[in-house]
Swiss-Prot record:
Residue ranges, annotated region (Disordered): 1-48
Domain of life: Bacteria
Keyword Flavoprotein: no
GO molecular function: rRNA binding; structural constituent of ribosome
Organism of derivation: Chlamydia trachomatis serovar L2 (strain ATCC VR-902B / DSM 19102 / 434/Bu)
Complexes and interactors: Part of the 50S ribosomal subunit.
Name of the protein in its database record: Large ribosomal subunit protein uL15
One GO CC term, this protein: cytosolic large ribosomal subunit
Keyword GTP-binding applies: no
Length: 144
C-alpha cells in the first residue's frame, strides 16, 4: 500500500526553485553558481549568441561559399498607368527625379517599368531613358 508521505508530484515543472546565496550547505552559496571573476560573474551580463569564450567562433572559422549579387543589382520598380494618372497633370514631364520627388518610388531606384492597368487619359512627356514602357503602354500612348 502507498503511504501518503511517499507520494511524488508527477510533473517535473513544479521543481523547487534554486535558492542562491544562502550559505555553503545549499550548494549555491557565496558566488551563487556564477564562479569566480570574469564576465559571467558580473550582473547584467548576457552572452552573445555564437560567443565561444574569446576564441574564433564557428561562423568565422567556416569558409564563405558563393556570391550574392544583391549589393550590385539595379533596383527596378513597377508603376501602373492608373497611378500615373493620379500623380501627374496633363502635359507633365515624367522622369525618375519627378517620381522620387512625389515619393512614388524609392530614392535608390535606378529603373522604372510602366505597366498597363487602367486608362491613361493624360498626355505625358517621357524624359528619362531609365523609364521603360510595356508593349501595352506603348500602344496606348500611340492611340492618344
Amino acid at each position: 500500500m502507498i503511504k501518503l508521505e511517499c507520494l511524488q508530484d508527477p510533473s517535473p515543472r513544479k521543481r523547487r526553485t534554486k535558492l542562491l546565496g544562502r550559505g555553503p550547505s545549499s550548494g549555491h552559496g557565496k558566488t551563487s553558481g556564477r564562479g569566480h571573476k570574469g564576465d559571467g560573474s558580473r550582473s547584467g551580463y548576457k552572452r552573445r549568441f555564437g560567443y565561444e569564450g574569446g576564441g574564433v567562433p564557428l561562423y568565422r572559422r567556416v569558409p564563405t561559399r558563393g556570391f550574392s549579387h544583391k549589393r550590385f543589382d539595379k533596383c527596378v520598380e513597377e508603376i501602373t498607368t492608373q497611378r500615373l494618372n493620379e500623380i501627374f497633370d496633363n502635359g507633365a514631364e515624367v522622369s525618375l527625379e519627378a517620381l522620387k520627388e512625389r515619393k512614388v518610388i524609392h530614392r535608390e531606384t535606378s529603373r522604372v517599368k510602366v505597366i498597363l492597368k487602367g486608362a491613361l487619359d493624360k498626355k505625358l512627356v517621357w524624359k528619362d531613358a531609365a523609364i521603360v514602357l510595356s508593349e501595352g503602354v506603348k500602344s496606348l500612348i500611340e492611340a492618344v
